[in-house]
Amino acid sequence: MIRDIYARSRNTYGVPRMVGQLHRRGHRVSRGRVARLMRANNLIGAHASNKWRRGRPDAGGVPDLLQRNFRADAPNQRWVADITEFVTGDGKLYLAAVRDLFHRGIVGWDTAGRQDAALVVSALTMALARTGHPTNVIHHADKGTQYTSLDFAFAAGNADMQLSFGSTGDAYDNAAMETFWARLKVEIAWIRGSIWFATRAEAHAYLFEFIEVFYNRQRHQPGLGHLTPAEYADKWRHDHGHQDLP
């Protein structure tokens, strides 16, 4: 049973997620016993230390509406966004993503060979289309020129969003995205043995499968009651009579 769950997690689950999945299947086992069984079978969860990057220069008078409170009571209340990069044989590939703080899923993303305003606008456009164009969403990001650009401000304004930026030089003000990037790269490296890709096309295809199939729909999270982001969002819609919402 433990080996099966571990394999289905793509060899990434550690003890907490393993315990949660066993409990979901009706097996009431202690954390200590699971830890011993995993050690005995050399089943190790994906792990690495986080590396925080520095923030960017100030962005006018736009306030920080989150103040490091990375929680939401419902979908589409608070989104966080950022850009990271991967090295490929074709050169760098930049990934921009938008994460919903309620169910922790990625609602919008895109990749490109340049980290410009068009990239973050594309990720935002996907997020809006996927979620039914909600209004009054808080969109929180760092002060990179992509997010402070006129193109992005125009796109966010057309969607009636509230823009929010962390304080200058403090990456912890966007910690929810920083931790996602750390887990993304740790687990990709754990599964593939490397985060290097031969081509940008290969990297994009792999990121599509990892984000859309594995992370959003298969990877269970202890903070969500050991549900996946998709399951957690579906449960909220069912409990609140919003099955018609995307």
Predicted regions and their residues:
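Charged DNA-binding/catalytic regions of mobile-element recombinases
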Residues: 1-246
